[in-house]
Amino acid sequence: MFRQRYPDVHILTRETNTREQIVPLSEGALDLGLLRNTQLPDTLAWERVLREPLLAMVPADHPLARQPSVSLAALAREPFVFFDPHVGTGLYDDILGLLRRYGHTPVIAQEVGEAMTIIGLVAAGLGVSILPASFQRVQLSEMRWLPIDEQDAVSEMWLVWSKHHEQGALAKRFRESLLAWKTEHN
């Protein structure tokens, strides 16, 4: 939508994790950020742009792969491939918090920094994991995506900006376009 309206605008994107965006957003060095829900300082404003289910990933030859869905309890009993807590992704807090709310602490077999690495390691048979449904676009024959039984297994993505630093006209238009997209698609 934004690209169609403003084809000559070059958007400089920086791929960083949630934690790495908070200070630059607060200081006005970043105009906008897309973050998974996390604790934000009072200097930042946000609006939810996406709410999506979390899905389980299991190796294709795993017994759970034959099930139509899976519980958090069943996943927590398996070796877990998960985010490194030092990387600072909002998904780490989302997923671990969900498991803990249901009284589960996963046995973490492998910690990595990127979701794509998690997908590859699950496909290689090193464990199970959980990621948002938007990652389901990655289809590998060695793994299977499964719905999670618990209805509150969801993740949100937020558009975040500074409350105290004025945004340029194009950043404001981009924000308006993204929020209009959200209204159309939610």
Where are these regions (language model features)?
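Beta-alpha-beta core module
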Residues: D42-R48, E52-P53, M57, M116-K163
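Conserved functional loop/turn residues at catalytic and ligand-binding sites
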Residues: H10, P24, G28-A29, R48, ...
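Short helices/loops that flank or line small-molecule/ion binding pockets
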Residues: R14, R19-A29, L96, R100-Y102, ...
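Central regulatory/effector-binding core of bacterial HTH transcription factors
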Residues: M1-D42, E111-V112
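Residues at or immediately flanking beta-strands
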Residues: D8-L12, T105-A109, E156-W158
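Short loop/turn segments at beta->alpha junctions
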Residues: N17, S71, G113-E114, P132
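Secondary-structure junction motif
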Residues: F80-Y102, Q167-R175, K182-H185
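Flexible hinge/capping segments at coil-to-helix
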Residues: L44-F80, A171
